[in-house]
Amino acid sequence: MLKFIQNNREGTALLAILTLFALLGIIDRNYFSLQTFTMIFSSAQILILLAIGATLVMLTRNIDVSVGSITGLCAVTVGMALNAGFGLAASCLFALLVGMVAGFFNGILVTWLRIPAIVATLGTLGLYRGLMLLLTGGKWIEGLPADLKSLSTPILFSISPIGWLTMLLILAMAWLLGKTAFGRSFYATGDNLQGARQLGVRTDSLRIFAFSMNGVMAALAGIVFASQIGFIPNQTGNGLEMKAIAACVLGGISLLGGTGTIIGAILGAFLLTQIDSVLVLLRLPAWWNDFIAGLVLLGVLVFDGRLRCAVERNIRQQKYARFTAQAIISDKKPTVSDNNPAASNKKKAAL
């Protein structure tokens, strides 16, 4: 059972989502509907985008805790560009470029300067957050044009253009990681860095690419945030890094690298957003969200560690049982002297 759970984390996350839907559907019949599903998906888009980027980084056995600050910085970038008179496309491209540069800088710190990822990105967390506040003077950005808000307006099947783009990104990343040699390089790098290098994988370039794409996903999340609420607070992105990591771990992405799928991370993000919707349904204050996210992350990490130890212990017991069985069988095999009485008599005569 434990081995099944470890090898099917995506299925476990999906089962948890369906179970929560069923329980809430019993409590409130209006909850179990297509409208509720699309509403949760719309709310989950920011976390899904962050989980996509975090997956790439975590698969290479790294971590990025600056994505919340990058999200806020890029949201401010697109807002300031729009208010300065730039078009929507140019403003979004500028924000994506800022996110890519921020992620690239993280990758340089980790890969070339050999700074541990947690230390490097803790530093850039404060750096990017401070830059965001310097640009805004600590003020909110308001008066955003309607063009930006149209990105989150439902157009087809109650899903917005950003929603459709998010689904395309999910499919593209699932194909990249699961069906291409380049995608498998992420797993090889996280599983065994030296072994991947011997196989010809350009591990430094790959890790820099992972951090850069993480920055792009954070920038896209910042654009989605600005389009959904129509203004940009000075605390935009706070705490999102913890939720992104929690979503990935919940969906089966290992902090030790080399394990997990993008689908699992997406399901983890959806489950966390669903839990937030439960808090709204129960009319609990909004500050419970971070508490629940931290509690879920801690619980999943503890469970994941205990599960891994239990599975390894079970594997060792099975190996020991097979070794013992083989030893017993070899002891019971008849010797040459047992099968040949003449050889046994000659041996006795020699003695």
UniProtKB/Swiss-Prot annotation:
Write out the GO MF terms. transmembrane transporter activity
**Chief site of localization:** membrane
**Keywords (A to Z) from UniProt:** Cell inner membrane, Cell membrane, Membrane, Transmembrane, Transmembrane helix, Transport
Which Pfam families does the record associate with it? BPD_transp_2 (PF02653)
Please provide, in alphabetical order, the Gene Ontology terms of the cellular component aspect for this entry: plasma membrane
Q: Which domain of life is it from?
A: Bacteria
**Membrane-topology annotation of the record:** Multi-pass membrane protein
Extract the InterPro entries matched here.
Answer: ABC_transp_permease (IPR001851)
Q: Transmembrane helix: is it a keyword of this entry?
A: yes
The yes or no answer to whether the keyword Flavoprotein is present is: no
Transmembrane segments annotated in the record for this chain: 14-34, 39-59, 70-90, 93-113, 115-135, 155-175, 213-233, 252-272, 284-304
Q: Where in the cell is it found?
A: Cell inner membrane
Instruction: Tell me the subunit arrangement.
Output: The complex is composed of two ATP-binding proteins (LsrA), two transmembrane proteins (LsrC and LsrD) and a solute-binding protein (LsrB).
Per the entry, what this protein does is:
Part of the ABC transporter complex LsrABCD involved in autoinducer 2 (AI-2) import. Probably responsible for the translocation of the substrate across the membrane.
Similarity field: Belongs to the binding-protein-dependent transport system permease family. AraH/RbsC subfamily.
> What's the name of the protein?
Autoinducer 2 import system permease protein LsrC
Q: Identify the species of origin.
A: Yersinia pestis
